[in-house]
């Protein structure tokens, strides 16, 4: 089951992510009114190289430590040493690739921008390994504090720099300062005396092998569209697409992603009891979609209001069109999150590798075809097709891992689907009634969102869903 302690732990992480995203929204609101889509496109292109290198070279030290029943000082030293080695390797790879990258994309500014942006992921490699003790105890207040303070300092730096005339460097500064600050704060919250050692590396190696391979494929998969578009479309168009993509994934990154850490810890505790694990997985997947589906559908229905309220001006109008469809694509991809945690908890990282490889294949095939035949909207449509395919792949994978039939998995979600359909219909009717009344975008967005949320919660109530039941096992 998902215990109340797990839910409280998830609440801390979700609160941290929501607080951080709220700060990000304020930062973007300021930057988008000062900078141009081309500035965001340039930074997104530089971040693509950083993201690929960061993901490929990622060592899931915290996840590996969480799975251990007994964590000694030697384990922490090994994790810290691996983090340093990873940071050094990342520095070398990024600096070596920065200049060729700028030549390929015909923009000399990318060299310096890539070098500076690399400081962020390098600093995250040095995160205090002692934080694992809090995670194993289901205490996430410390992670909440570190992330939130980092976001506040990052936002203050970015806003100050843009008003001082720093241009696109304000975006880079936000990324770097946030990571540096969060890492430093972890040492205040979870003190650790650094020591170099690889004495326990064998206990990390099996887990890291498959996981690193999966990360390589994942990096190529998630950054493929930006690399492809960066080469064939203008930086302004790339900026519009990137902004829409970042807004579309806000629900899963803010609500779902952070909640999966305590869920994985809970799965790990009951992995030897298959029946309890099945019940817990069904509850986690239902709760994931309970949150993700209405938010993503709501974003799709109000994409024009979101862009007008947050970004302002006609220069971002194409982002609203892309967001309308990318938000829907995110609905199905959210279902992957609990499956990811399940695979790690039961020591099956090879499953993640296979899933990522399947997704990469379809992304390369469909996004390339979509861009070739229908330009940017074709790429957006391809993203939706890939997410639907991966949803059914995830259903089949869960059946193989813990013996849950696809019919049971889909049946576990039907009330969410019906409630969201009712919400979508009534929100469309409301927007039709409000059309032409010349309301302020922020006011209309707030009213529409509140109306949609009330309808959705009411529909769930009518269908017998009670949110308090989340702390009870699934029957």
Language-model regions, residue ranges each:
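Interhelical loop/hinge segments that connect adjacent transmembrane helices in multipass membrane
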Residues: 1-2, 6, 141, 145, ...
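Alpha-helical transmembrane segments of multi-pass membrane transport and lipid-handling proteins
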Residues: 34, 81-106, 112-116, 156-164, ...
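Membrane-interface helix-capping segments at transmembrane helix termini in multi-pass transporters
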Residues: 4-6, 32-46, 68-78, 91-119, ...
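N-terminal membrane topogenesis motif
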Residues: 1-25, 58, 63-66, 71-81, ...
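Signature of the first transmembrane helix
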Residues: 2-60, 86-100, 115-118, 150-159, ...
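Membrane-proximal transmembrane or re-entrant/amphipathic helices at the cytosolic face
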Residues: 399-406, 413, 425-475
């Amino acid at each position: 089951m998902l215990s109340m302690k797990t839910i409280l732990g998830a609440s801390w992480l979700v609160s941290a992510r929501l607080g951080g995203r709220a700060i990000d929204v304020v930062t973007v609101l300021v930057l988008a009114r000062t900078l141009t889509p081309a500035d965001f496109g340039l930074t997104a292109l530089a971040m693509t190289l950083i993201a690929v290198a960061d993901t490929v070279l990622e060592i899931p030290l915290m996840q590996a430590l969480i799975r251990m029943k007994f964590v000694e000082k030697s384990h922490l030293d090994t994790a810290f040493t691996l983090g340093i080695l990873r940071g050094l390797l990342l520095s070398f790879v990024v600096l070596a690739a920065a200049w060729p990258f700028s030549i390929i994309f015909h923009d000399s500014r990318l060299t310096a921008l890539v070098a500076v942006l690399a400081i962020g992921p390098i600093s995250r490699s040095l995160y205090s390994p002692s934080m694992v003790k809090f995670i194993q105890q289901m205490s996430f207040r410390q992670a909440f504090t570190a992330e939130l303070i980092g976001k506040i300092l990052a936002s203050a730096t970015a806003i100050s720099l843009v008003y001082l005339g720093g241009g696109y460097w304000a975006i880079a500064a936000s990324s770097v300062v946030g990571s540096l600050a969060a890492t430093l704060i972890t040492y205040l919250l979870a003190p650790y005396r650094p020591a170099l050692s690889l004495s326990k590396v064998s206990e990390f190696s099996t887990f890291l092998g498959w996981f690193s391979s999966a990360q390589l494929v994942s990096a190529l998969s998630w950054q493929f569209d930006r690399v492809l578009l960066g080469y064939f479309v203008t930086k302004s168009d790339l900026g519009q697409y990137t902004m829409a993509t970042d807004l579309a994934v806000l629900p899963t990154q803010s609500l779902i992603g952070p909640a999966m850490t305590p869920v994985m810890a809970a799965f790990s505790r009951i992995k030897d009891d298959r029946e309890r694990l099945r019940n817990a997985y069904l509850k986690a997947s239902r709760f994931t979609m309970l949150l993700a589906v209405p938010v993503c559908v709501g974003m799709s229905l109000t994409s024009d209001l979101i862009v007008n309220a947050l970004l302002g001006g006609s220069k971002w109008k194409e982002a609203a069109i892309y967001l309308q469809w990318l938000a829907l694509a995110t609905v199905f991809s959210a279902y992957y999150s609990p499956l990811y945690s399940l695979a790690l908890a039961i020591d099956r990282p090879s499953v993640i590798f296979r899933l990522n490889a399947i997704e990469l294949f379809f992304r390369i095939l469909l996004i390339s075809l979509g861009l070739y035949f229908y330009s940017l909207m074709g790429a957006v449509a391809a993203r939706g097709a890939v997410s639907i395919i991966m949803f059914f792949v995830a259903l089949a994978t869960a059946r193989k891992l813990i013996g849950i039939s696809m019919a049971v998995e889909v049946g576990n979600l039907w009330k969410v689907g019906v409630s969201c359909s009712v919400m979508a219909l009534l929100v469309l009717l409301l927007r039709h009634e409000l059309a032409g009344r010349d309301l302020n975008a922020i006011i209309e967005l707030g009213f529409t969102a509140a109306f949609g949320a009330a309808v959705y919660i009411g529909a769930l109530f009518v269908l017998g869903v009670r949110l308090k039941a989340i702390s009870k096992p699934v029957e």
